[in-house]
Amino acid sequence: MSEESQVPSDPLGRYEGLLREWLIESGGRRVDVYYNAIHLTGEIEYWLIDRQGREQPVRPSREVRFALHDVRPAQTDPHRGAWLWSHLWMEASDGVLHQECDWMREPVIGSDPVGDGDAAFELDQFPRDPQWVPEWMAVKAAAYHKEAERRERRRQRDRERRARKKAEAAGAAEATGEQSGSDASGQVDE
């Protein structure tokens, strides 16, 4: 690893240095990175444009890929939360990382839709001002919380039912002991 990639202490600067180093080593002209994320789930695609202008999917070094995971939390905005989609790119000619982000777009991760829990956990992990909560996220988070409340009510009913059964069983055992005819002296009535 070069000294240049170790110097930046901020995640974006570190990622920029690692990506620049990898791009130069790969001999590419440009790299584009597409990052969809919500909560702890994400999908990242890297596309390299080689010197002949051909675009191809690539998989950079592990160090480059892992460094990107620190960028999103570091860029959290106190009002908008964390972005959900980002396009990062770098031209080998200038070695500067560029970025555009979207805080409102519903991420597309694989073929699975974003789950209700993902939306709720995203809001817990990266809170947002109400005007920065997209409708799709609000609907999914509300559905998750409604289901969680329903499950908690069911668990409470189950706890109460078990407690009643336990009390009934204890009462029945006590009643059975009384019905056997024993008194406090241990003598049996005849």
Question: Model-predicted segments: where are they?
Answer:
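Surface-exposed polar/charged interaction patches
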Residues: 21-25, 74, 139, 168
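Short beta-strand micro-motifs enriched in acidic
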Residues: 89-93
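Alpha-helix boundary/N-cap detector
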Residues: 3-10, 14, 59-66, 124-131
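Extended intrinsically disordered, low-complexity coil regions enriched in Ser, Thr, Gly, Ala
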Residues: 35-63, 81, 98-112
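N-terminal "first-domain core" detector
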Residues: 1-54
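Short, solvent-exposed interaction modules
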Residues: 59-80, 86
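Acidic, proline/glycine-rich low-complexity IDRs
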Residues: 98-190
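Short, structured motif recognition centered on aromatic/hydrophobic residues
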Residues: 31, 86-88
